[in-house]
């Protein structure tokens, strides 16, 4: 690698590469979430028989990981580049290695290891077999074949490739702190995100209102369940995401007991399962249109 790519150049390179592999380029979903997997572009689209190939950057908020902008690698909000392909191409690992090559990382010249790391998100009823991808000793990607989403079996097999953009960029730019990364045009990551990191950490650990958050969770849960009953899948899913983020804020404050924590997670999981079933039913009523489109293209 001669020229060190900025973060935005890394994003643009990955977008171009995966678009050439048949992925639609989506935008980040505008509700707080803890991982790119929780975007409806992955969570909902991974279930049911319809094909789906998409790539997008997803800001992911994890309140408990905030460190007031003082830790070089631990963040309240990090960015994932998410690729989801359904059905999974047989050569998905080769495609992934091709994406590294597009970034100037020749797999033949670097130590790239797929380390078994099966994945699960119990609160959303998700599980899969997968690997961490280590690049010269640093984990930069999570690679997963989904087995279950929202408590439903995933068929056809769906593959997910999740790049940790901060880690990958730190490797490419050879910096120790994410705040020293060049985002683009000479502007550093710290110039953009250090102050928000401090303020969100202060809120999460010191200023959040527990009583208000508990009421919000209850209200969001009630609305999500009501909307599922009304057949409004996507608004319902938004409220499930709000429940998840609200729980994460409560959890970060350290005021949730072990028993209460299990209860919150069970409530989120129940909603996720209901909305997953409702989504498949909705798509079936529509005649699984993307399946028809795919069959017509194959003729």
From Swiss-Prot:
**Which is an annotated GO molecular function term of this record?**
transferase activity
EC class: ligase
* Protein name in UniProt: Glycine--tRNA ligase alpha subunit
The EC number on file is 6.1.1.14
Which coarse location class describes where this protein primarily resides?
cytoplasm
- Keyword Aminoacyl-tRNA synthetase present in the record's keywords: the answer is yes
Q: Answer yes or no on keyword Coiled coil.
A: no
Q: Which UniProt keywords apply?
A: Aminoacyl-tRNA synthetase, ATP-binding, Cytoplasm, Ligase, Nucleotide-binding, Protein biosynthesis
Family matches, as HAMAP family: Gly_tRNA_synth_alpha (MF_00254)
Q: Which gene specifies this protein's sequence?
A: glyQ
Q: Say which family it is in.
A: Belongs to the class-II aminoacyl-tRNA synthetase family.
């Amino acid at each position: 690698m001669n020229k060190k790519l900025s973060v935005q150049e890394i994003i643009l390179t990955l977008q171009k590469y995966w678009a050439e592999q048949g992925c639609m380029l989506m935008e980040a979903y505008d509700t707080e979430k803890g991982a790119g997997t929780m975007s409806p572009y992955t969570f909902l689209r991974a279930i049911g028989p319809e094909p789906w190939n998409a790539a997008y950057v997803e800001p992911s908020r994890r309140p408990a990981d905030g460190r007031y902008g003082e830790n070089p690698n631990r963040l309240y909000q990090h960015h994932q580049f998410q690729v989801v392909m359904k059905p999974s191409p047989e050569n998905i690992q080769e495609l992934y290695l091709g994406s590294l090559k597009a970034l100037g990382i020749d797999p033949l010249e670097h130590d790239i290891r797929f380390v078994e790391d099966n994945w699960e998100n119990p609160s959303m009823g998700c599980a899969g077999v997968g690997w961490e991808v280590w690049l010269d000793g640093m984990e930069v990607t999570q690679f997963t074949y989904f087995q279950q989403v929202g408590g439903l079996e995933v068929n056809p097999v769906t593959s997910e490739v999740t790049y940790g953009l901060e880690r990958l960029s730190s490797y490419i730019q050879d910096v120790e702190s994410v705040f020293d990364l060049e985002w683009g045009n000479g502007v550093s990551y710290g110039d953009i995100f250090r102050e928000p990191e401090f303020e969100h950490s202060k809120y999460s650990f010191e200023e959040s209102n527990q009583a208000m958050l508990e009421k919000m969770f209850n209200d969001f849960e009630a609305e999500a369940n009501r909307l599922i009953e009304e057949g409004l899948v996507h608004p319902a899913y938004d409220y499930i995401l709000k429940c998840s983020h609200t729980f994460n804020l409560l959890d970060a404050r350290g005021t949730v007991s072990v028993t209460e924590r299990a209860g919150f997670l069970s409530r989120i999981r129940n909603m996720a399962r209901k909305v997953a079933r409702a989504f498949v039913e909705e798509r079936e009523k529509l005649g699984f249109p993307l399946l028809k489109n795919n069959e017509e293209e194959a003729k």
